[in-house]
């Protein structure tokens, strides 16, 4: 099941329309327009669906609509949260309404029910036979993975506080330990393509509470810990390990990566970006990455872009779906993808409409 549209608003900011999502996606925009907020919002919605803690829940209000494609079915799930209560909730399948809820009543398949005010209906009506679509949404949420690329810190050793995942919190050691020799070799070969001259990756158990990942680099005598690597190398290698780990697990429903490429040089940003986007397309993993990195923008086709602009509390997504002429006309300018973003082309085009 794939997320095809994401709509969201809260007390201090709102998407003016739903963001359409494809198999792979790049969120771009200037600083402080809302790229990280969009990724964090999807993460928070996954948490709420799973009844996990939502540490960044807005104090007063948020509302979201998630639209999925499941083979031939279109599933649209909407809910609104206000003052610790669910004030709206609806579920439609191919345009047919199965669930409606407001502050006065809740109808599920035409029957009146009374879910607790602070619970989604799918929390209290789980049944794989009677309500299979609830289970599909929950399974989707269980398989949302993510990573804050810019917060991967070599000083954290095996800790992975940078990960955005409601239920999957495996650390670096656990991921490497679970991989076969072939998978480890895949990571080494991918690292070498990025000009990181790794020769070996292995785990080391000193005592029960001290478990390490050890790296061997060409022409370096001593073994290296993750904390011995440069910040850029640490970020790239951590992403490669997660990428391989995900490839041997049940594939994730959605992989969120915030600030992709931050801290890497031109050559490695380009190579890692191509590697990641190609990997996700080939493995059928939906990817949503954010970046304002010049180099990364130039290697990701504009059809996969969502450009965010902000006017006060309103965040405006621009994409080939809602502005086809903007994107199609740009192909004839001869400019680079980054010029599309950084020049006044967009503002001139939108003002002329």
Residue spans for each PLM region:
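Residues immediately C-terminal
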Residues: 44, 262-263, 295-296
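Walker B motif beta-strand of ABC-family P-loop ATPases
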Residues: 254-256
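Phosphate-coordinating catalytic segments in nucleotide- and nucleic-acid-processing enzymes
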Residues: 48-238, 242-246, 337-347, 351-353
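Conserved SF1/SF2 helicase motif Ia
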Residues: 251
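Helix N-cap at the start of a conserved alpha-helix in ABC-type nucleotide-binding domains
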Residues: 266-267
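Walker B catalytic acidic pair
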Residues: 258-260
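Pre-Walker A-like glycine/lysine-rich segment at the N-terminus of P-loop NTPase domains
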Residues: 1-47, 54-61
